[in-house]
């Protein structure tokens, strides 16, 4: 097994990278007080790299830095709250912060502030890890529009699908599509699927998932007349075409298959 903790630890290749990582992590964790910033930075710098990465993921308690001294106005408020830096429990869902697309990677811009720290770990893996540092990056985490991995599905060597969802914006899909199609990875088309914008349809893969080359699970409340758009490069320019066909027919055509099976699941199925 390969764990995220291992990959990040391997990416901290020297003390300079470690300090860069700590500073960026603390800024994104919302540590604004300069004295507290330096105390926590020193705490992390003196830890073994693996232990530091684990602590960053599990959150930093006030008791961890061993001081009850009140150095700022904020120290007098919310004194019962145990954490200085909150844990990152959603790291469990590793398909959201970054997505492998062919031999490239999308380091995603998360929709909610709560989850944005997660992609920092991916940034350092694909910037410094000896094995993965040369991986083509197809989307950067600091883009102003959001995209999450649960909306990105690789359907074949030439086609990917991306959900336009509550968490993934059309502007982000255009950026990703342009980078993917202009790269030498081999993809030729991006299928953008407009799904309902609600928590129960949070990502494309919660309601539509490929389980075989010609079989897909689909939530029964997903209509077959969803708005589907095909994005491709024509004469080096991004071309977007709306399909006036059912999702099933679009998949058959774009994946060059004679038959597509949609397996209803969830709800009363």
Where are each of the predicted segments found?
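The feature marks the mature, well-folded catalytic cores of soluble enzymes
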Residues: 1-269
């Amino acid at each position: 097994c390969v764990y995220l903790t291992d990959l990040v630890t391997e990416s901290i290749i020297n003390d300079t990278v470690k300090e860069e990582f700590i500073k960026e992590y603390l800024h994104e964790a919302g540590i604004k007080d300069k004295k507290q910033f330096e105390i926590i930075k020193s705490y992390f710098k003196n830890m073994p790299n693996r232990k530091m990465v684990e602590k960053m993921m599990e959150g930093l308690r006030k008791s961890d830095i061993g001081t009850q001294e009140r150095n700022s106005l904020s120290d007098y408020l919310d004194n019962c709250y145990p954490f200085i830096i909150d844990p990152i429990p959603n790291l469990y869902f590793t398909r959201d912060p970054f997505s492998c697309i062919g031999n490239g990677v999308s380091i995603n811009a998360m929709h909610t502030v709560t989850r944005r720290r997660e992609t920092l770990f991916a940034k350092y893996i694909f910037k410094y890890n000896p094995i993965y540092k040369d991986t083509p990056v197809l989307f950067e985490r600091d883009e102003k529009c959001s995209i999450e991995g649960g909306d990105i599905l690789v359907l074949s060597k030439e086609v990917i699908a991306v959900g336009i969802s509550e968490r993934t914006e059309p502007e982000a899909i255009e950026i990703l599509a342009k980078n993917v199609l202009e790269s030498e990875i081999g993809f030729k088309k991006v299928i953008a699927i407009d799904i309902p914008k609600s928590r129960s349809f949070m990502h494309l893969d919660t309601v539509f998932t490929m389980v075989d080359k010609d079989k897909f699970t689909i939530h029964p409340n997903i209509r077959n007349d969803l708005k589907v758009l095909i994005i491709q490069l024509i004469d080096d320019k991004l071309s977007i075409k709306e399909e006036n066909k059912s999702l099933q027919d679009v998949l058959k055509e774009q994946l060059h298959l004679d038959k597509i099976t949609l397996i209803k699941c969830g709800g009363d199925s």
